[in-house]
Amino acid sequence: MCRSSNLEKYVFYDLETTGMSPAFDQPLQFAAIVTDLELNEIERVDIRCQLSPHILPAPQALAVTGVRPSQLQNNNLLSAFEFSQKIQIFTEKWAPAIWTGYNSIAFDEAMLRQMFYQNLQPNIFATQFHNNTRLDVMKMVFAVHAEEPHILKWPINAKGKVNFKLDQLAPENGFRAHNAHDALGDVEATIFIVDKIKKQCPDLYQKLFDARDKERNLQLLKSFTPVEVTLRFGGSSPKTYTGCYCGLSKNSKNMVGFFDLEKPDPMELIHGTQQDVLDAMTKSPQRIRSLRLNQAETIRPASISNPEWRHTCDVIKDDTAFQTVVSECLADKYPQTEDTDSVVEEKIFDGFYSNHDKTLLVQFQISSWQERLTLLNDAQDNRIQQLGHRLIAFNAMHLLDPKYIARAQEFIVEKWTASETEANWNTIASVQRQLAELEASGFDNILLDEMKTFY
């Protein structure tokens, strides 16, 4: 059953950031509008923060958002640490809620998660836990395009393909007040699109709304009845696939096998070898797809069915050996490996913190910087110690001994001067390349000169 009540509400949100990497960029703006389920506004917030000392913003990102270098150095803004604290409090205030954005699962949520992690917030997964659910409106739009394309107008790009970007889709459908690439403007545009889907196609809207809850989705899949999901790969058009649950990865409770019911000869695969199953996952055409329950996919009951599909589902349900093979093949396809050379930003999923460290992080929020430095000596997880000393270097450097100060300064120099081919973050070399590309494209000279002076 879906979790729903009269108190349930949406939190529509968006971020503007220094670049595209959740691990190595940062949010500069967080905007959100809380509504009831009828999309009546309850509250809105619009928060900005300073640039962290170790981050070089991508010139191309500044060009898109229109953020001026002077805004990045505004000392009246919150620090990144204070910014993350304020957003964490906001998530707690409105839980449980339906956290909703446009392409939010792939981008905004990952950015939020990293921001909480790197700024030592107690609840890294704040939008996913505490009975929160999630919707990604871009995925809803994909389902509309595949199932009910007449209810929206579709902007076409230079290649003759549909442009699903919000800054194109919203104006094409009548949203005239869109301040594109401003977080609050994008939130308003997202609500506009949801409202249009809700009014124009209430049946499909309800199915997509019900898919917000991953526990409900797992129950639906494990009913071994035909279900459908709309997916988009690369630049292709979204397509709805009809299939059946066929196993849960032995390595991840969030990954399931999805058996394509529209492909021929299902029994041949069900009674085949383990290699046949692995081939069905890895070779084209795919007969078994992997779905991630924590990615807000648009899983819903199949709109049509037939006796053959239902029979295939029944066979899979009874064939636990086949489900076991699928479970093992999913684990083989997506092995869990530990990268011992990864930097701390990339270790966000290296296990949950102990209860001791969780309690420490709660205390960290209400302590002075001097007290925070002392608390770090008690942390069991090396990630907390490393990120914590970085925070103190950025926010209260006077508390550190010369050894740590020198190390912090060396860290920034090494980060900025790293080889562009080896770094996953913005470096001086990548910044200079992007500035040259903007200049060659005829970008606004005034803003470009400001950028050059800033860098």
Give the label of every model feature segment.
Residues 24-30, 34-65, 91-202, 208-211, ...:
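Metal-dependent phosphoesterase core characteristic of DEDDh/y 3'-5' exonuclease domains
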Residues 2-79, 249-254, 263-284:
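Conserved RNase H-like, two-metal-ion catalytic cores of nucleic-acid enzymes
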Residues 2, 196-321, 414-455:
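Acidic two-metal-ion nuclease catalytic site recognized across multiple nuclease folds
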Residues 68, 78-80, 165, 206, ...:
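General structural signal for secondary-structure boundaries
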Residues 250-418:
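Long, charge-rich C-terminal accessory regions
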Residues 13-17, 84-87, 241-242:
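Short alpha-helical segments and helix-capping/turn motifs at coil-helix boundaries
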Residues 64-148, 303-306, 311-362:
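Conserved DEDDh/DEDDy metal-dependent 3′-5′ exonuclease domain
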Residues 77, 81, 106, 184-187, ...:
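Generic detection of long, well-ordered alpha-helical segments
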